UniProtKB/Swiss-Prot annotation:
<feature type="domain" description="LRRNT">
    <location>
        <begin position="29"/>
        <end position="58"/>
    </location>
</feature>
<feature type="glycosylation site" description="N-linked (GlcNAc...) asparagine">
    <location>
        <position position="226"/>
    </location>
</feature>
<dbReference type="GO" id="GO:0043679">
    <property type="term" value="C:axon terminus"/>
</dbReference>
<dbReference type="InterPro" id="IPR000483">
    <property type="entry name" value="Cys-rich_flank_reg_C"/>
</dbReference>
<feature type="repeat" description="LRR 9">
    <location>
        <begin position="248"/>
        <end position="269"/>
    </location>
</feature>
<keyword id="KW-1133">Transmembrane helix</keyword>
<keyword id="KW-0325">Glycoprotein</keyword>
<dbReference type="InterPro" id="IPR013783">
    <property type="entry name" value="Ig-like_fold"/>
</dbReference>
<dbReference type="InterPro" id="IPR032675">
    <property type="entry name" value="LRR_dom_sf"/>
</dbReference>
<dbReference type="GO" id="GO:0005886">
    <property type="term" value="C:plasma membrane"/>
</dbReference>
<feature type="repeat" description="LRR 7">
    <location>
        <begin position="200"/>
        <end position="220"/>
    </location>
</feature>
<dbReference type="GO" id="GO:0007416">
    <property type="term" value="P:synapse assembly"/>
</dbReference>
<dbReference type="GO" id="GO:0060322">
    <property type="term" value="P:head development"/>
</dbReference>
<dbReference type="GO" id="GO:1990138">
    <property type="term" value="P:neuron projection extension"/>
</dbReference>
<feature type="disulfide bond">
    <location>
        <begin position="309"/>
        <end position="334"/>
    </location>
</feature>
<feature type="repeat" description="LRR 5">
    <location>
        <begin position="155"/>
        <end position="176"/>
    </location>
</feature>
<feature type="region of interest" description="Disordered">
    <location>
        <begin position="385"/>
        <end position="407"/>
    </location>
</feature>
Length: 649
């Protein structure tokens, strides 16, 4: 049996504990008025906020702040006190620097679609437990990443830097990274040290860069022993890369390049590879046995290649017919010769390969006869193709011409200044080529900052017009023979030339066509006699028509008075003539006009007379007032114009 005193003590203790815990509970469940809170998820997105609201609950785990206008000044310092926050969504805001004051234990940070330019060690060291960092669609460049910025990011597994301004792979990335996305930047080269140590990397995406075979080191991917997916889509490769890591690589994407050759050892030891895509390239044949090591291949996609179904492709037919059902091969359709065009290689008979044909496409190694060749260093703008001490460099005039070598002209380039911001580039090829890489750079600019502009032109073209240049500025133009028709060109040495645009003023045309076009408005050409006579007749005819129209308009009233009926009259004209004439006659209205018929020749008396109206046959109604006591009585037509029925002499 509990005594009353002891019961009172227990009740008081419970009340005290409740009073202490209640404020904390209320504070934990508070929510900013502009947000919505739901069990640790704070929804403040799409609210046009310029700063992160205060009063976020302490038990928050995920902050949705995307699609606002939050800038760096709008991140409060007390945000770092939210120790339970693990995910922050700040994409599509107005950040121009990597944000600070973030919660220490955040693991997932979304900063896409801002304008972030710099990444510093100070900002990353305050969030050491970060595992996923997404920086797509920002303005990050290689020089804006501080050296050693990631040295304390020992838990970082995923780094997305797609669609930025990178010209090289960032140095010093943590070894823990498993997925690295660098697509749609301007990376021309990848050296072995840049990826050295990334032994945990499983997925590497390098789509849409400026990579060619010279820009890839010999064994740049070889040490990535855990790599399972490699994507090199939309680059400038002319041959499939070699020395790929064969231990775990399962997916390889090489589509949308300029690959016209596959080295025999390109896919050696890739026994785990099950998906290979080489669509949209320039492959016409494949070396025999190229797929022998692909033990686990199940998806082989080779669409949109100019396959030449000659004798060298007969082995492919035999290989396809021996594959198990689980292997899915797409895109092996003949494009040449014409007799098998559009047919699947797998369905061809042995006789159709025509192995005795002397015109079979073959792959031959060729080297260009260019003496004293200077090979460009990596990450630098390529030097001129030859050293010729006895020949002076061309002066910076409007027109220039250069060739690959006096002994053998591989490419001959001619550049002409067309306008103050346009140059015309033309070239001649000594060898048939499938594609060339044309690039231009304003002199005085560093290639590291993305000022090089490149484009791929087909071998059939012989000229190109470059626009949107700066007036009165020097430029360097280079061309690289990427490949030749059915041949592989190992030496991709550029041929360069310097030129300058015209000053910004009234441009004086330099071409004969432009001169003729400018002079043409001031010429007095001899017109044909028939044209002169026809023009004179037309002018006289127009003048006569104008005179007739003027005369008819002037005498229109006279003509109408001579007619008994005038259908074009208006009702108010009838009223005006009928109500003002004084005559001892009867007013007859016919159609829309009238006629005064005299009754006798007697003089008009001064007595009051009444004009009796004869209604016309067209149904026009006249509303008449029967009150005739006063001379001021009036009746109104339906048009509102007064009509006097009584008049006094």
């Amino acid at each position: 049996m509990i005594s009353p005193a002891w019961s009172i003590f227990l009740i008081g203790t419970k009340i005290g504990l409740f009073l202490q815990v209640a404020p904390l509970s209320v504070m934990a469940k508070s929510c900013p008025s502009v947000c919505r809170c739901d069990a640790g998820f704070i929804y403040c997105n799409d609210r046009f906020l310029t700063s992160i609201p205060t009063g976020i609950p302490e038990d928050a785990t995920t902050l949705y702040l995307q699609n606002n206008q939050i800038n760096n000044a709008g991140i409060p310092s007390d945000l770092k006190n939210l120790l339970k926050v693990e995910r922050i969504y700040l994409y599509h805001n107005s950040l121009d620097e990597f944000p600070t004051n973030l919660p220490k234990y955040v693991k997932e940070l979304h900063l896409q679609e801002n304008n972030i330019r710099t990444i510093t060690y100070d900002s990353l060291s305050k969030i050491p437990y970060l595992e996923e960092l997404r920086l797509d669609d920002n303005s990050v460049s290689a020089v804006s990443i501080e050296e050693g910025a990631f040295r304390d990011s020992n838990y970082l597994r995923l780094l997305f830097l797609s669609r930025n301004h990178l010209s090289t792979i960032p140095w010093g990335l943590p070894r823990t990274i498993e997925e690295l996305r660098l697509d749609d930047n301007r990376i021309p080269t990848i050296s072995s040290p840049s990826l050295q140590g990334l032994t945990s990397l499983k997925r590497l995406v390098l789509d849409g860069n400026l990579l060619n075979n010279h820009g890839l080191g010999d064994k740049v991917f070889f040490n990535l022993v855990n790599l399972t997916e490699l994507s090199l889509v939309r680059n400038s490769l002319t041959a499939a890369p070699v020395n790929l890591p064969g231990t775990n690589l399962r997916k390889l994407y090489l589509q949308d390049n300029h690959i016209n050759r596959v080295p025999p050892n390109a896919f050696s030891y890739l026994r785990q590879l099950y998906r290979l895509d080489m669509s949209n390239n320039n492959l016409s044949n494949l070396p025999q046995g190229i797929f022998d090591d692909l033990d686990n291949i199940t998806q082989l996609i080779l669409r949109n290649n100019p396959w030449y179904c000659g004798c060298k492709m007969k082995w492919v037919r035999d290989w396809l017919q021996s594959l198990p059902v689980k292997v899915n091969v797409r895109g092996l359709m003949c494009q040449a010769p014409e007799k098998v065009r559009g047919m699947a290689i797998k369905d061809l008979n042995a006789e159709l390969f025509d192995c005795k044909d002397s015109g079979i496409v073959s792959t031959i190694q060729i080297t260009t006869a260019i003496p004293n060749t200077v090979y460009p260093a990596q990450e630098q703008w390529p030097a001129p193709v030859t050293k010729q001490p006895d020949i002076k460099n061309p002066k910076l005039t409007k027109d220039h011409q250069t060739t690959g070598s006096p002994s053998r002209k591989t490419i001959t380039i001619t550049v002409k200044s067309v306008t103050s911001d346009t140059i015309h580039i033309s070239w001649k090829l000594a060898l048939p080529m499938t594609a060339l890489r044309l690039s231009w750079l304003k002199l005085g600019h560093s290639p590291a900052f993305g000022s090089i502009t490149e484009t791929i032109v087909t071998g059939e073209r012989s000229e190109y017009l470059v626009t949107a240049l700066e007036p009165d500025s020097p430029y360097k133009v280079c061309m690289v023979p990427m490949e030749t028709s059915n041949l592989y060109l190992f030496d991709e040495t550029p041929v360069c030339i310097e030129t300058e645009t015209a000053p910004l003023r009234m441009y004086n045309p330099t071409t004969t066509l432009n001169r003729e076009q400018e002079k043409e408005p001031y010429k007095n050409p001899n017109l044909p006699l028939a044209a002169i006579i026809g023009g004179a007749v037309a002018l006289v005819t127009i003048a006569l028509l104008a005179l007739v129209c003027w005369y008819v308009h002037r005498n229109g009233s006279l003509f109408s008075r001579n007619c008994a009926y005038s259908k074009g009259r208006r009702r108010k004209d009838d009223y005006a003539e009928a109500g003002t004439k004084k005559d001892n006659s009867i007013l007859e209205i016919r159609e829309t006009s009238f006629q005064m018929l005299p009754i006798s020749n007697e003089p008009i008396s001064k007595e009051e007379f009444v004009i009796h109206t004869i209604f016309p046959p067209n149904g026009m109604n006249l509303y008449k007032n029967n009150h005739s006591e006063s001379s001021s009585n009036r009746s109104y037509r339906d048009s509102g114009i007064p009509d006097s029925d009584h008049s006094h002499s």
